[in-house]
Design a protein with these regions (language model features):
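Hydrophobic, membrane-interfacing alpha helices
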Residues: 3, 8-311
Length: 311
């Protein structure tokens, strides 16, 4: 019932956003539009540049890690396990996000230049490598990479993994909120043109008013994180079994991502000929995985699974 209500609210919100221009747009002139053109750089020292995206990305990961650390302490799990979890998670998130972008969105380019998948370099016209930083991280790839990393963490630590995955899933929403704010500071992953009253103009893209989808997603993630921690505080594992929060987060995030893609500009050219874009196609299996995990964990997992192997 909780899931159905939440999904209905997602649909109503996205429907309001998508149709807002028909209802409200004509009431506002371009003077009401928000022209969004921040400097993505915080400061430069020599060749070093500190970007807002990097700072917000790091803030999201640190705060998410802090939340998981609190749960480890609450359940009396040894500190060494948390330290190992951080290492595995970082590798899974980074490699998954990077490879996800390279293989899902630009496979032809990166398969011909595999070194650029892993190293922050590019090749110039003369065939020489130069430092260019990493350009392109895919959130779906990050989710897949993180889940694989958690499986390796389970193999190494022998911990009951479902509670850990629950905590990581809750924390992921917090990290995602800050990452989308970083995208906003970079004026990237923009929405489709619109005339809704809250439209943003991104001068680095064009002069068209667009849906600020980065804000939509960031606000959704903040709300989802808040709802999840309230549910966890009220129910913990007394009324639900381990795996519940993981399943719920997968369904909510994938469901919202599928919906918001309708007002998001396509990321790569080949998506123009697709019925659904790449983000939507990748969201479908994650949503179905959440459904399967919800049924399996709540019917088959023991209630005391979260208390095993915690030394």
């Amino acid at each position: 019932m909780l899931y159905v209500c939440f999904m209905n609210s997602q649909f109503l919100i996205l429907n309001f956003i998508a149709k807002g221009s028909k209802t409200f747009g004509s009431q506002f002139s371009t003077l009401n539009l928000i022209v969004w053109s921040p400097n993505p750089e915080i400061f430069n020292i020599g060749n070093f540049t500190l970007l807002w995206y990097g700072v917000l990305f790091a803030m999201g990961l640190v705060l998410a890690g802090w939340y998981v650390w609190r749960r480890f302490n609450e359940f009396g799990i040894a500190q060494r396990h948390f330290e190992n979890l951080i290492i595995w998670s970082f590798l899974g998130i980074f490699l998954g996000a990077r490879l996800g972008h390279c293989l899902f969105y630009e496979p032809e380019y990166f398969l011909s230049r595999p070194i650029e998948m892993f190293l922050p370099v590019s090749i110039d016209e003369m065939g020489n490598y130069f430092f260019s930083g990493y350009h392109g991280l895919a959130s779906h790839g990050a989710v897949i990479g993180l889940m694989l990393a958690l499986m390796l963490f389970k193999w190494q630590s022998k911990l009951a993994i479902l509670p850990v995955m629950d905590w990581m899933a809750i924390a992921t929403a917090l990290a995602g909120a800050f990452i989308r704010l970083g995208n906003l500071m970079n004026s990237e992953i923009v929405g489709v043109p619109t005339d809704v009253a809250w439209a943003f103009v991104f001068p680095v893209v064009d002069e068209l008013p667009r849906h600020p989808v980065q804000l939509y997603e960031s606000l959704f993630f903040f709300v989802l994180f808040g709802v999840a921690i309230v549910l966890f505080k009220k129910m913990n594992y007394e009324r639900v079994k381990p795996g519940f929060y993981l399943s719920l987060q997968l369904m909510m995030i994938a469901g919202f991502r599928f919906c918001v893609e309708f007002v998001k500009e396509i990321q790569v050219g080949f998506e123009r000929d697709m019925v659904l874009n790449m983000g939507q196609w990748l969201s479908v299996p994650l949503f179905l995985l959440g459904v399967v995990l919800m049924v399996w964990t709540q019917k088959c997992v023991k209630n005391n699974e979260n208390l095993e192997n915690n030394e």
